[in-house]
């Protein structure tokens, strides 16, 4: 059974466990690089189970969602209260051919987008962090909440990649 938006929020925010979201986001690219540094592209394309994403697919997903996160923040900054469109990650994975993407290129794209997004976030006034958008599935989300969600999302996928990277061949 697919989780509800409320369950998703609770699970993703639960990953933070009191960690500062900007610090989590700043640390993620280096953690990803460390985890995949010694893995071959073919190893990164191996799915851990039917219906589960490979490391390569997760890296492509992270790159695309970083683009989404940056767009959401910029849209909210330019028009407080703006609608925020949801997206189906599985549709994006299939139609964006995540399984065929070069994992190293996905990681480089993620890193570049993350650096740009962090530079913007660090420049915001305290007041701007309260600007919000209306997410199509989750309702009102401030920039602060968007950043927390993306940091929790990072931690979720870091755990998945770490588990797959440690798994023996077979």
What is each stretch, according to the model?
Residues 26-53:
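A glycine-rich, hydrophobic loop/mini-helix early in the fold
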């Amino acid at each position: 059974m697919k989780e509800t938006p409320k369950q998703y929020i609770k699970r993703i925010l639960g990953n933070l466990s009191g960690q500062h979201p900007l610090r989590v986001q700043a640390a993620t690219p280096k953690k990803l690089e460390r985890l995949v540094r010694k893995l071959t592209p073919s190893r990164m394309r191996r799915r851990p189970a039917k219906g589960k994403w490979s490391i390569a697919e997760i890296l492509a997903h992270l790159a695309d969602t970083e683009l989404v996160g940056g767009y959401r923040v910029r849209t909210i900054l330019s028009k407080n209260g703006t609608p925020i469109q949801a997206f189906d990650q599985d549709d994006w994975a299939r139609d964006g051919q995540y399984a065929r993407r070069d994992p190293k290129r996905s990681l480089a794209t993620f890193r570049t987008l993350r650096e740009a997004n962090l530079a913007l976030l660090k420049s915001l006034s305290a007041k701007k962090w309260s600007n919000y958008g209306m997410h199509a599935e989750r309702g009102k989300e401030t920039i602060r909440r968007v950043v927390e969600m993306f940091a929790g999302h990072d931690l979720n996928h870091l755990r998945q990649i770490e588990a797959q990277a440690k798994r023996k061949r077979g």
